[in-house]
From Swiss-Prot:
Record's protein name: Probable glucuronosyltransferase Os03g0107900
GO biological process: cell wall organization; glucuronoxylan biosynthetic process; protein glycosylation
Species of provenance: Oryza sativa subsp. japonica
Topological domains annotated Cytoplasmic: 1-33
Lumenal side: 55-427
Record function comment: Involved in the synthesis of glucuronoxylan hemicellulose in secondary cell walls.
UniProt keyword terms in alphabetical order: Cell wall biogenesis/degradation, Glycoprotein, Glycosyltransferase, Golgi apparatus, Membrane, Signal-anchor, Transferase, Transmembrane, Transmembrane helix
Coiled coil segments of this chain: none
Keyword Kinase recorded: no
Subcellular location: Golgi apparatus membrane
Amino acid sequence: MAMRGDPKQRRASASAPHGGAAHHVADKLRRHSTFLLLLLLLWFALSLYLFLSATPPPPRPAFLPSTSTPRPALRIYVYDLPARFNRHWVAADARCATHLFAAEVALHEALLAYAGRAARPDDATLFFVPVYVSCNFSTDNGFPSLSHARALLADAVDLVRAQMPYWNRSAGADHVFVASHDFGACFHPMEDVAIADGIPEFLKRSILLQTFGVQGTHVCQEADHVVIPPHVPPEVALELPEPEKAQRDIFAFFRGKMEVHPKNISGRFYSKKVRTELLQKYGRNRKFYLKRKRYGNYRSEMARSLFCLCPLGWAPWSPRLVESVLLGCIPVIIADDIRLPFPSVLQWLDISLQVAEKDVASLEMVLDHVVATNLTVIQKNLWDPVKRKALVFNRPMEEGDATWQVLRELEILLDRSQRRHVESWKR
């Protein structure tokens, strides 16, 4: 007869399966809770990322200094020349640092504080030679003389060549000079004389930063060069109301030299008679505000104008180009074949009008057509703060300003030069 088991043992063995099931359920609940917690954390992190990605950063005022200017790859060594080549000129006449040719001073000062300035010449990509040739105000008409420019630059090059090996290493090809006057490094305000003189031989392999630029070939741009804007003090953009807020009660504005009886100077006429024709055609037209006399507060007149006329003088370029953009007045450029600074940024066709010299008689009709069709579009493009900033030389340099644009153009120029060198080597 089989023996019956102990009742306690039977209860224990009977209850064992139920206790294991409870532990199994509890373990499943813990794993499920952990999974839910991880899922919740993942959802929160993803939501936060999407929110931050979709939130635009607050806009930064256009003319405030940037605190995050990227450090450009370009390394520039600035020669420390004796003061007679630069600083003495500013000390002798304060106009040297502020007039329309003062880009040579502004660029020098900006590069001295530039984050990419090379402390050692061996680390440099380019070499900047700071010579101020536009500061000799000894002439009767108040404009600077350029008669000393070639000799002063030649002295600077001789000094650089004698004291350091870098000029001789490249024959000056990696050296940068500023030529911020009428016909660049030809150093004469009259085009026929400038062409006859040409660029000094010792500068022809160097890089020139010049206000002069025309389409096609020209003796005065027969060297690697970057077209830069004429100097206008950055404060101009801050002195008057923001362009979009200005009351514009002048239709078309010009104040400057307009000869009633143009003089024949060696077979050439000032402005190719364009300014004379403007005066003859529109001098009595009430829509045109044309004045021949100087006026210290002329920029306030520009700020009140829809269109600012920018006819050529002896040279095609004019500080009116920059002043017009800064003051929100549409530049009307009357200078055939002119090349303008920083075209990829300024997009000149979108912010200005270009009228052929031969079409001055049709100017009123052209301006009326713009008013009737796309005036607001042009003004919107023109009033972009990026455009204004690109034309002023800040000291120190700010991201996007004229010096910053010059460095960008120099990088492009170097890249193009290196590609040419590689391609010639491959041949």
